[in-house]
Amino acid sequence: MKLTLLGAPGAGKGTQADILSRKLGVPTISTGNILRSAIHDGTSVGLAAKSYIDKGQLVPDDVIIEIVQERLAQPDCAEGFILDGMPRTIPQAEALIAHGIELDTVLSLEISDEEIVQRMAGRRVCPRCGASYHVQMNPPRKDGVCDACGTALIIRADDAPETVRDRLHVYHEQTEPLKGFYEKLGLLRSVENVGSIEDVSREIFRSLGIGE
């Protein structure tokens, strides 16, 4: 299965993408993680992207498309993939189609802006491997430490409330129109992100027609 997850920053895309990845046996391709790795490594792409991410702005399409194309060409994507954070604009969606990257389903996670601001205040991320946690909804086994690699978790600058609101404005202006774009193609499925992580996962499985 080849699908992408849509939703505002903090809507739970990363968490649900990881669950779907294990369920379907296909990799999650997170543009956010790819870019953060590039920033951490000090690559030219990372340095170019850093100023946009820190301000809550979108990274230019040409940078995103190049990174995604390289990743999808790897062997582990042959049987399918889950895109997390791509596309973010209609031009990006059109570029995916133009480059022969076809999707089976587009899943949109729905949640209010105020709920997102509250949730992101509790988000913690691993600067080394990119794993994401939440102090209440998805805490690590040891407080402040990544389960996967043991690195101390951090609060990202773009999770600050004022930056979150800026990112939400960008989302509504530039990314939300994708729902209409994919609805016209018959690919869109929407799921309300309410209840526990497990509740939302069950609703996603039902929407995609896969068993628990």
Predicted regions and their residues:
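Glycine-rich phosphate-binding loop of ATP-dependent small-molecule kinases
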Residues: 1-212
